[in-house]
Curated annotation (Swiss-Prot):
Cofactor comment text: Binds 1 NAD(+) per subunit.
Enzyme active site: C413
Taxonomy of the source species: Bacteria, Pseudomonadati, Pseudomonadota, Gammaproteobacteria, Vibrionales
Chain's role: Catalyzes the conversion of urocanate to 4-imidazolone-5-propionate.
Cofactors, names only: NAD(+)
Gene for this chain: hutU
Family from the record: Belongs to the urocanase family.
The protein, known as: Urocanate hydratase
Pathway(s) this gene product operates in, as recorded in its UniProt entry: Amino-acid degradation; L-histidine degradation into L-glutamate; N-formimidoyl-L-glutamate from L-histidine: step 2/3
Length: 565
């Protein structure tokens, strides 16, 4: 019997999970308490999209395979010694092995399939049988911090859009987008922070209401005319969650000859079965059809995606700055016959890659104490250590003022190779001397400079043609394991869906110890350095210059790097 024919072991409406706060340990040390708390934090109802189903974000991105596996992971982390390592296979704890104190306490592999079988059809069959779990990026690797996790990256993208297309001034301009889930929900706040107004189309009213409660969206509308009136009449940037179907609304704007200034999308188009509502379907009808005829759902969803992408292309032809925001909607439309679906660029090659060349990406940390003051103190420390970056300081000020913490207090801050280790050492010292009430964990999104291969997103259009080479995230995971990250993860299919990406993650616990300081020195240098290495190897001059300045040893490039010092 499959788990969908019987009672679904992934669903338990009686559960409410929240991470412990304070200094009292359930585990034997902070090195095992840290992954325990972050796993639980991923399932906090203030953090996760559907916590009763173990779904954290991104369609069906889960923290554990089922509730039995979750309970067993918790049990093992509570008894795990500091010379043991827990292995987790697609959300299931499968082994505990002797290692050493500087090895990772947890090693995670999620959603990985042999390439020939790396598609949604095969994954869904395994998923039905309880043999796999979709880990997305930070869901199954236990370092999701709510929508804040993508706010700064989205903000940086919109700032870059304003610079490239509007001479740096977004005043009076507006963005059209779709999706207000765990990732897409960051768009309205990021957009208004960057000076744009925004209409974000969402078919699930509960998601709009959640973004209203948490301050990520300003107003709700139930018709396009109402949404347009709100942004037209406002003297300041305003965001509107519009209840509707993205394909319908995007097409209506084309028909009415209304052209936004910027067009993008963050629906869960990467997962046509679970993540995208076909035109003309209700939420309840879609839920029923997923149980009755999965193929029909996928077919209808992809057909609607094609309609939406065609509308995006039409709006682009009328002058809208149009970009793919990494959900693989262009690929889905291409498969449905929209031959020029890739005529608008992905956000990474268009706006983010120069940052990746310097190892700059979504560095994040969380306060295991649960006390917001610990985050505010680390915010100030970042300003002290990076004094000459007013853009970064402005971000930290806006984040404190406008971003509500979800679950354990956390912060996202895009910094690169030259700063990550320094910040980690400073945070560790703050724990050691008692400035912070409990240890800090430092991690990142898998969307980072050296940790992902995703030809339709992070590695789209690499200058040497190496878009699909996935050796790089494997090397990143191996190096972070060797360096002593507290937990390391290796996933497949995050962001863009099965068959289209491989990526790795790491988290390191700053517990104030000298051993932690040594691990931080290795991990928080090596991790971003792999991104600089990867881009230098692909031929990017910015990356080569950074490699030379930071003294990286890249055997095939060292002679060239000497000339750049």
């Amino acid at each position: 019997m499959t788990q969908r024919q019987g009672q679904d072991p992934r669903l338990d409406t009686s559960r409410t999970i929240r991470a412990p706060h304070g200094n009292k340990l359930r585990a034997k040390s902070w090195l095992t308490e840290a992954p325990l708390r972050m796993l639980m934090n991923n399932l906090d109802p203030d953090v996760a999209e559907h916590p009763h189903s173990l779904v954290v974000y991104g369609g069906i991105g889960r923290a554990a395979r089922n509730w039995e596996c979750y309970d067993k992971i918790v049990e093992v982390l509570e008894r795990l010694e500091d010379d043991q390592t827990l292995l987790v296979q697609s959300g299931k704890p499968v082994g505990v092995f002797p290692t050493h104190k500087n090895a990772p306490r947890v090693l995670i592999a999620n959603s990985n399939l042999v390439p020939h079988w790396a598609n949604w059809e095969h994954f869904n069959e395994l998923d039905k049988q309880g043999l796999m779990m979709y880990g997305q990026m930070t869901a199954g690797s236990w370092i999701y911090i709510g929508s804040q996790g993508i706010v700064q990256g989205t903000y940086e993208t919109f700032v870059s859009v304003a610079k490239k297309h509007f001479n740096g001034d977004a005043k009076g301009r507006w963005v059209l987008t779709g999706g207000l889930g765990g990732m897409g929900g960051a768009q309205p706040l990021a957009g208004t922070m960057a000076g744009f107004s925004m209409i974000a189309v969402e078919c699930d009213e509960s998601r709009i209401d959640y973004r209203l409660r948490t301050g990520y969206v300003d107003q709700k509308a139930t018709s396009l005319d109402e949404a347009l009136a709100i942004i037209t009449e406002s003297d300041t940037p305003v965001s509107v969650g519009l209840l509707g179907n993205a394909a319908d609304v995007f097409s209506e704007l084309v028909e009415r000859n209304i052209t936004p200034d910027v067009v993008t999308d963050q629906t869960s188009a990467h997962d046509p079965l679970n993540g995208y509502l076909p035109q003309g379907w209700s939420m309840s009808h879609a839920a029923e059809m997923r149980l009755q005829d999965e193929a029909a759902v996928v077919k209808a969803a992809k057909k609607s995606m094609a309609v939406q992408v065609q509308a995006m292309l039409d709006l682009q032809s009328r002058g809208a700055a149009t970009l793919d925001y990494g959900n693989n909607i262009r690929q889905m439309a291409l498969e449905e016959g929209v031959e020029n679906a890739f005529d608008f660029p992905g956000f990474v090659p268009a706006y983010i890659r120069p940052l990746f060349c310097e190892g700059i990406g979504p560095f994040r940390w969380a306060a295991l104490s649960g006390d917001p003051e610990d985050i505010y103190k680390t915010d100030q420390k970042v300003k002290e250590l990076i004094p000459d970056n007013p853009h970064l300081h402005n971000w930290l000020d806006m984040a404190r003022e406008r971003i509500q913490f979800q679950g354990l207090p956390a912060r996202i801050c895009w910094v690169g190779l030259k700063d990550r280790e320094r910040l980690g050492q400073a945070f560790n010292e703050m724990v050691k001397n008692g400035e912070l009430k409990a240890p800090i964990v430092i991690g990142r999104d898998h969307l980072d400079s050296g940790s992902v291969a995703s030809p339709n997103r992070e590695t789209e259009g690499m200058m040497d043609g190496s878009d699909a080479v996935s050796d790089w995230p494997l090397l990143n995971a191996l190096l972070n394991t060797a360096g002593g990250a507290t937990w390391v993860s290796l996933h497949h299919g995050g962001g863009v869906g099965m068959g289209f990406s491989q990526h790795s993650g790491m988290v390191i616990c700053c517990d104030g110890s000298d051993d932690a300081s040594q691990r931080i020195a290795r991990v928080l240098h090596n991790d971003p350095a792999t991104g600089v290495m990867r881009h230098a190897d692909a031929g990017y001059d910015i990356a080569k210059q950074c490699a030379a300045e930071q003294g990286l040893d890249l055997p095939m490039l060292n002679e060239e790097l000497k000339k750049l010092k």
